[in-house]
Amino acid sequence: SDFARLLAIQVVDWLHDLEKSEIGFELFSLVEIGPGEGTLSRDLILAVGEIAPALISKIEIVLVELNAGMRERQEKVVNKLEGVNYRWSNIDDLISSPVTGVIVANEVLDAFPVERLVFTQNKVFRQGVSLRRKNDDYYLEFVDLMPTSLIMNFLNDSNSLLKIEFPPKDICNRWVTEWHCDLPNWFKKLSNVLSNGSLLVVDYAMESKRYYSANRKDGTLISYRNQEANSNLLKDAGLCDLTAHLCIESTINYALTNGWSFMGETRQGQALLALGLSGFLYSLQNTDINNLSAALNRRESLLRLVDPMGLGDFRWLAFQKSNNDDLILGKRFLEEPTS
């Protein structure tokens, strides 16, 4: 995919930077957390091979997948790769044998569990779900629970460390928002997985002033079934995917307090343009007339990647882990777009 080809340009930069730093290692690891069908890992390693063939023998792909059914599907994709080192693992096993390289988490964190918080009459509640019975029918409904000490710590720390006001001024009654409660531990674990290298998070995210705006009265949590969004989170419970945006400042703070340094963040559209997407578009001008249909389809998919109303609004957040003070990783994805 073109997405993988462009991302590979940044990945190759990082691997070359690690190579120059003369850090001792057996193989560089290209780790994908939650690899889906396995197509991104496959396309990434193929693109790395095109850009820097000498690196292929020095790299292993590590797919971190907990679901046995998904792993079987990934095997069908990745097993077709020739001359490539690859394996499946989990975070705990990687902690016991840390790696050097690049970790990619593409559309992973938006699916993490969240605590849902309800603000009403100067009080905050933890939102719970209760199973109720009416006649012979059972149904789910939201209930207000007392907040845990962890929730109160989150609210206090957000205020004191990040200057995020809870609740914001002029909220409606029963203003709702989310807290990504599993992020601190995730960053902590990953900092023990990686000895030296980078972590790239690609996901739905927004600044705290938008995330915790009085106008965003229902939070960011949304339900998807068959690619259709629904704000009724209890409809078809158990059959839907639930996703919630990340708060950029909170996410960065959790990384900084759990072993990472912050390299920078940008919108996906800007990142891909910086990595040369416009050059990909330009090359389509020389398409043979017989391949016009394929070229137009490719042009559409490239433009979708940078569409500010869609995929282009994804955020790229990059973090560095280093046990070597001399390690400097480049940030081509943050540079001014190339023409």
Walk through the language-model features, giving the residues of each.
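Beta-sheet entry/capping signal
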Residues: 29, 60, 87-88, 100-102, ...
